[in-house]
Amino acid sequence: MNQFIHPDFKLNGKSFSYIELLSEALYLKENGQLFEKNIGKFLLEWLNNESFVLVQTSGSTGKPKKIVLQKSAMIASAKATGTFFNLQPKASALLCLSADYIAGKMMLVRAITLGLQLDTAEPNSNPLGNKKYDFVAM
């Protein structure tokens, strides 16, 4: 269903075709650190032939549960965020949230959809280091 990858999209400095991104996702899922495994798992779900992804709610308003999100709605949200923040292709972005949760998943969707150059970092209290980014969700 979702084979579109913006030509300007980069993950940790590397460009990917659809097949290459699938391969990278599988590698991360099998061999990465925990935060990278979560990225790999989500990318595999994002790139599959289903029209939806399953997302675990946080439980902040009740019992945690799995919900279905349509990929088309996630793409529309990514585009709306890009418009609101005037994010242009090749803008730098940082994923420093777990891809186990919607905020981290949406950073990946935004990067793939808008052509952002996304760096990933293990979630911690000081993820930025010395690099400046155009867009970071924290």
Region locations from a protein language model:
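Conserved pre-ATP/AMP-binding loop-to-beta segment of ANL
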Residues: N38-V55, P89-K90
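Flexible, charged surface loops at secondary-structure boundaries
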Residues: N2, L47-N48, N86-K90, P127-Y133
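AMP-binding/adenylate-forming
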Residues: K71-A76, S92-M138
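N-terminal leader/targeting and accessory segments in enzymes
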Residues: M1-K37
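Long, mid-chain structured domain cores
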Residues: T83-L87, D119-T120
